[in-house]
């Protein structure tokens, strides 16, 4: 890909940066914008927010994340999402309408595919149908859509391939790896390439890797683990035609949940951010 990322102004982080200038190491980089519906986020408000972002970003490439599937995160730290399948599909349709003819990167539902491994048979089938319906709507836009497949130690290559096929991967640009996780870029790269080889369809999917917090790789802890570091800066210069970009999908400094000294999931913590910066190699 030959795109230039959109670099947003972090107006809501200016005070933190004044107190901790090192955090500019994060705020100077392009980050993703996450969208969903909830008690304080109506579908209409979300649609208007997306439109404003796209207008500000034009002609540059913003990264958007859809994160609103019913029973999100299986009710764990990042629980929430739409109240019903109908509400969710309405949200997806409005999301697509908000895109217009723009071509942003869209990361579709972090962890929602691998989570099907932990769902009952009927619930898993229902989620699959919902994903396929969403993919059909998203495929009618100009967006570069990537279905999230989790981290490299979650699903085997064969299982990941099977799920992606069932979710109609051929209708979108490809898949995303390591969203909000910590696995080293080299590990993610091999996993993604193996999936691409395994699919072996007429149109081989492309993939992107979240490098926001993988500078020191992963350990056995998934929630605000100690000793992690920011990873490779966002770029489309990956030296591999199947790897579209290294992205900061998870905003470095945003918490994984109220674990290991972190605040509620999604809340920014200057202490978490500073740790990631200080541990950078």
Residue ranges and their predicted role:
Residues 80-102, 110-142, 157-159:
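Active-site cleft segment of glycoside hydrolase catalytic domains centered on the general acid/base Glu
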Residues 39-47, 85-88, 124-127, 157, ...:
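Solvent-exposed, acidic/flexible segments
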Residues 50-54, 92-96, 131-135, 161, ...:
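Generic structural signal for well-ordered alpha-helices
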Residues 73-78, 110-122, 145-151, 176-184:
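Active-site-proximal beta-alpha loop/turn segments in soluble metabolic enzymes
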Residues 8-27, 152-271:
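Surface-exposed substrate-engagement region within the catalytic domains
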Residues 2-98, 251-276:
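N-terminal carbohydrate-binding/catalytic regions of secreted carbohydrate-active enzymes
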Residues 56-60, 94-104, 133-145, 198-204, ...:
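A structural motif corresponding to the C-terminal end of an alpha-helix
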Residues 32, 59-65, 103-107, 142-146, ...:
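Structural preference for beta-strand elements that scaffold enzyme active sites
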């Amino acid at each position: 890909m030959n795109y230039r990322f959109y670099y947003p102004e972090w107006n809501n982080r200016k005070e933190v940066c004044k107190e901790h200038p090192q955090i500019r190491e994060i705020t100077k980089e392009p980050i993703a914008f996450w969208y969903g519906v909830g008690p304080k986020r109506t579908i209409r408000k979300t649609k208007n927010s997306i439109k404003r972002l796209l207008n500000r970003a034009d002609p540059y490439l913003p990264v958007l994340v859809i994160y609103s599937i019913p029973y999100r995160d299986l009710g764990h730290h990042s629980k929430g999402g739409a109240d019903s399948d109908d509400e969710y599909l309405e949200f997806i349709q409005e999301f697509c309408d908000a895109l217009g003819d723009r071509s942003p990167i869209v990361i579709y539902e972090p962890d929602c595919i691998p989570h099907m491994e932990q769902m009952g048979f009927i619930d898993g089938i229902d989620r699959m149908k919902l994903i396929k319906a969403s993919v059909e709507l998203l495929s009618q836009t100009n967006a570069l859509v990537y279905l999230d497949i989790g981290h490299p130690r979650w699903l085997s290559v064969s299982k990941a391939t099977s799920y992606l096929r069932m979710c109609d991967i051929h209708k979108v640009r490809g898949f995303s790896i390591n969203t909000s996780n910590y696995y080293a870029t080299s590990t993610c790269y091999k996993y993604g390439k193996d999936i691409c080889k395994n699919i072996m369809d007429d149109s081989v999917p492309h993939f992107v890797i979240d490098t926001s917090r993988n500078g020191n790789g992963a350990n056995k802890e998934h929630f605000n683990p100690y000793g992690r570091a920011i990873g490779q800066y966002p770029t489309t210069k990956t030296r591999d035609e199947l790897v579209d970009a290294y992205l900061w999908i998870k905003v470095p400094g945003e918490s994984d949940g109220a674990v290991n000294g972190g605040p509620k999931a999604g809340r920014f913590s200057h202490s978490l951010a500073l740790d990631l910066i200080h541990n950078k190699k």
